């Protein structure tokens, strides 16, 4: 029996950041991981996807070469080199996490860990005991129960990241973040991309106006969208779906299922520890503690917010709670980004949410086409919406366009400090920068 102050199951962003924070504050930590350090985000999610998106962005710029005075520009897309660059990025960051797991106070154990009881974990036949346990096992791709889902040409985002060549025809089932990012990237790589989505609009967590404008912009680049369409079956290269009461089909060489993710709750021994959970995730309170005192669940596995940075900050919160330290993290101010081209980002409430909750709110817009830096960059397609209460306190910000994530991040900081629109008006912004778009929106109040 090995005793330690804190056990963490899972070495993704939530797990390894929690371990680092705890070790820096003098706790002995044992981290268990049955795959690769870094979790889904680093190995088969955020990071490799963003590497591909960057390649796609460069290709899009090359196609606009004549607008920059680059006449008769020629280039050849070598997807193998694109994949190799993506893998180098992943391996560099993974090496950094591996090094982090060797810092004083952290013991890193490779293998599948299960709870024996509320204080004991078993891995590789060895038992480990701690007064506090953090479960950070993440999530996996959710597969829809339809005929043909098990075909070799039907893949999840994990498998799509490892394809050796660009598919001539790619059908994406689902227009959430994963589906939209891959639609944007593979369209740039040369695929004929079709997206089939059950809902009325793409990116349901995004402001509906922003989501519609983004979809329309991506459509202009050749991506075909079928909204309010339910997939019925897959047979060979044929995807059959129903839309507006009519059955339709689309042909594809590769079919990506991007219908969301589900928490990894199986095979952890949660029942033995008496933890309340369901297939929708582990139930936690405001401190991310389960019904069993001393056992916490952070990140995708609690399904509160399936974002890597959400997992990290939930982990910081938990460690501070264990240490008895005050925690001022504003979890309700959770920015997110979609790295399509152009990209989109969001924080806080949308206009629709304000209306649904009966909140008197004011919304003002600022357009990229009126910004000097956007014009100089030839990135004039974009919009930023700023939403505030009648007293001026900022409730949300939603944008699409070049570097939208960076613009929304500024507003996230302001929201964490309960900044008002009038206070934002008094903050000097560098000229010419895209950040002036945020200020322009404030000046419209």
Where are these regions (language model features)?
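Beta1/beta-strand and adjacent pyrophosphate-binding region of the FAD-binding site
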Residues: 1-12, 166-176
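Glycine-rich flavin
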Residues: 2-4, 20-27, 32-166, 194, ...
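Short hydrophobic core segments
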Residues: 7-9, 113, 128-138, 173, ...
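Flexible, glycine-rich terminal cap/loop adjacent to redox cofactors
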Residues: 7-35, 40, 47, 51-58, ...
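N-terminal Rossmann-fold NAD(P) dinucleotide-binding loop
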Residues: 15, 179-180
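Gly/Ala-rich phosphate-binding loop of Rossmann-like dinucleotide-binding domains
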Residues: 19, 23, 183, 187-188
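Short, acidic, Ser/Thr-enriched surface-loop or helix-capping motifs
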Residues: 110, 285-286, 388-390
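FAD-site-proximal beta/loop scaffold in flavoenzymes
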Residues: 149-167, 249-322
């Amino acid at each position: 029996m090995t005793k330690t102050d804190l056990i963490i199951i899972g070495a993704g962003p939530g797990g390894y950041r929690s371990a680092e924070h705890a070790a820096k504050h003098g706790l002995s930590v044992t981290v268990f991981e049955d795959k690769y350090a870094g979790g889904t985000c680093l190995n088969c999610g955020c990071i490799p996807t963003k590497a591909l998106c960057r390649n796609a962005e460069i290709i899009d710029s090359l196609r606009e070469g004549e607008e920059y005075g680059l006449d008769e520009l020629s280039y050849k897309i070598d997807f193998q080199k694109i994949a190799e660059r993506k893998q180098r990025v992943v391996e560099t960051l993974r090496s950094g996490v591996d090094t982090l797991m060797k810092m004083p106070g952290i013991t890193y154990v490779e293998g599948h860990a299960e709870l024996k009881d509320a204080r004991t974990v078993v891995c590789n036949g060895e038992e480990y005991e701690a007064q506090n346990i953090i479960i950070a096992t993440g999530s996996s791709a959710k597969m829809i129960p339809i005929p043909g889902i098990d075909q070799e040409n039907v893949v999840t985002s994990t498998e799509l990241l490892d394809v050796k060549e660009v598919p001539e025809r790619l059908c994406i089932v689902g227009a959430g973040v994963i589906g939209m990012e891959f639609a944007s990237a593979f369209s740039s790589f040369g695929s004929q991309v079709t997206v089939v989505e059950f809902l009325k609009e793409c990116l349901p967590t995004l402001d509906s106006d922003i989501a519609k404008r983004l979809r329309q912009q991506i459509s202009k680049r050749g991506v075909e969208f079928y909204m309010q369409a339910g997939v019925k079956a897959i047979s060979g290269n044929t995807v059959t779906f129903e839309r507006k009461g009519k059955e339709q089909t689309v042909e594809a060489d590769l079919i990506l299922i991007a219908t969301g993710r589900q928490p990894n709750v199986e095979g952890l021994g949660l029942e033995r520890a008496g933890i309340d959970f369901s297939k929708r995730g582990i139930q936690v309170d405001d401190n991310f503690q389960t019904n069993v005192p001393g056992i916490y669940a952070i990140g995708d596995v609690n399904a509160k917010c399936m974002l890597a940075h959400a997992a990290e900050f939930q982990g910081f919160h938990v460690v501070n709670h264990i240490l008895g330290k005050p925690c001022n993290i504003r979890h309700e101010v959770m920015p997110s980004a979609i790295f399509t081209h152009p990209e989109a980002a969001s924080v806080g409430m949308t206009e629709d949410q304000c209306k649904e909750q009966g909140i008197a709110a004011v919304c003002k817009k600022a357009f990229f086409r009126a910004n000097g830096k956007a014009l100089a960059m030839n990135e004039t397609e974009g919009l930023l919406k700023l939403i505030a209460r009648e007293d001026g306190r900022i409730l949300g910000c939603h944008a699409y366009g070049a570097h939208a994530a960076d613009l929304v991040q500024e507003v996230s900081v302001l929201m964490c400090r309960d900044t008002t629109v009038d206070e934002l008006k008094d903050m000097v912004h560098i000229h010419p920068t895209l950040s002036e778009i945020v200020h322009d929106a404030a000046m419209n109040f």
